A protein has these predicted regions:
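Family-specific signature for flavin-dependent thymidylate synthase
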Residues: 1-200
Length: 200
C-alpha cells in the first residue's frame, strides 16, 4: 500500500496517466484541483469565462466598489490601421474622462462604471478541477474562440507543465484533437481552417 504520491516513480505516473486517457470515465481527473490568478484580461474575457459553470469557481475584481484610477482597455487585433487606432485611443480617452468626471460630480462608482468599455482590463481568480479544465481548453483553444482565450490557456498549460509535466499539459488541446471531429458547425459558428482536416 502506498502512503504518499512521493512513492510513485515518474515512470509509474506516466503509465497511470496513459491508462486514464484510455477510458471515458474521467472522474479521477476531478480530484486534481487547480487555482489560477488571471491578470490583465478584458471583462469581455471574464464575461465568457463565468459561462463555464460546472467545476469552476470565480472571484472577480469588483468595479462596483473599486474606483478605476487609470483605465486600460485591450484593443482587439482587427484594429489595425492608424486611423482605426486613433479612433480607438480617442474614444478610450473620452470614456475615461467621462468616468472620472462622473465620480468627481458625486456619482457612485457602481453607477459610473456603466460608461466603461467591455474590454476594460481586469483580473479574476479561477478555481477548477483538471477534468473541467480539459473541457475548457477543448472549447477555448478552438480557432473560433477569441484570441485572448488562446493566450490565457497557453499560460495555464505552461503552469500545468511546470508543476505536473508534459503529459498533463499536452492533454489540454482543442476538442477536435480529442474527438477527431469539429464540434462547431452551426450556422452561427465561424469557419475554421481545421474543419477540412476532420470533416472529410
Amino acid at each position: 500500500m502506498r502512503h504518499s504520491l512521493d512513492d510513485i516513480s515518474d515512470a509509474e505516473a506516466d503509465e497511470i496517466f496513459a491508462e486514464m486517457q484510455k477510458t471515458a470515465l474521467n472522474g479521477v481527473f476531478e480530484w486534481i484541483t487547480l487555482v489560477f490568478q488571471v491578470d490583465g484580461v478584458s471583462r469581455a474575457f471574464t464575461h465568457q469565462a463565468v459561462r463555464h459553470r460546472v467545476g469552476f469557481s470565480y472571484s472577480q475584481e469588483s468595479m462596483r466598489f473599486t474606483k478605476v484610477e487609470d483605465m486600460d482597455a485591450i484593443c482587439g487585433p482587427s484594429v489595425k490601421t492608424d486611423e482605426q487606432k486613433a479612433l480607438w485611443n480617442d474614444t478610450m480617452k473620452s470614456v475615461e474622462d467621462a468616468y472620472h468626471k462622473l465620480i468627481d460630480a458625486g456619482v457612485e462608482t457602481q453607477d459610473a462604471r456603466g460608461v466603461l468599455p467591455t474590454n476594460v482590463v481586469t483580473r479574476i481568480g479561477i478555481g477548477t478541477n483538471y477534468r473541467a479544465l480539459v473541457g475548457l481548453a477543448g472549447d477555448r483553444l478552438c480557432l473560433q474562440a477569441q484570441g485572448e482565450w488562446r493566450e490565457v490557456i497557453r499560460q495555464m498549460k505552461e503552469e500545468v507543465r511546470r508543476v505536473w509535466g508534459d503529459d498533463f499539459a499536452d492533454y489540454l488541446q482543442p476538442v477536435c484533437e480529442h474527438e477527431h471531429r469539429c464540434k462547431f458547425e452551426s450556422v452561427f459558428d465561424r469557419p475554421c481552417p481545421l474543419q477540412k482536416k476532420w470533416n472529410r
